[in-house]
Amino acid sequence: MEHWGEPIPGTGQSWRQPLSTSGRGWLGSAPWRWLGPTSWRWLGSAPWWWLGTATWWWRLGSRW
């Protein structure tokens, strides 16, 4: 996200023009605060959950 001040493609608006000040606070803090730790935690646990689910589905499918 290096082009923070550049216009959004297709519009004349800038990334720094949110709908409201509350929107700016939410857009400025929530995604990064949420995506940071949560995504790392999810990425750390998801592969094992995904492998377990895939294996379970494979076993279920192989029985039919």
Swiss-Prot record:
Per the record, GO CC terms? mitochondrial outer membrane
- Note down the stretches annotated as region Disordered: 1-22
Biased composition regions of type Polar residues, renumbered to the chain: 11-22
The primary location reported for this protein is mitochondrion
Q: Which residues cross the membrane?
A: 40-58
Q: How does it sit in the membrane?
A: Single-pass membrane protein
UniProt source species: Ovis aries
Q: Where in the cell is it found?
A: Mitochondrion outer membrane
Which keywords accompany this UniProt record? Membrane, Mitochondrion, Mitochondrion outer membrane, Transmembrane, Transmembrane helix
Give the free-text miscellaneous remark of the entry. Answer: This protein is produced by a bicistronic gene which also produces the major prion protein/PRNP from an overlapping reading frame.
Q: Which domain of life is it from?
A: Eukaryota
Q: Under which name does UniProt file this protein?
A: Alternative prion protein
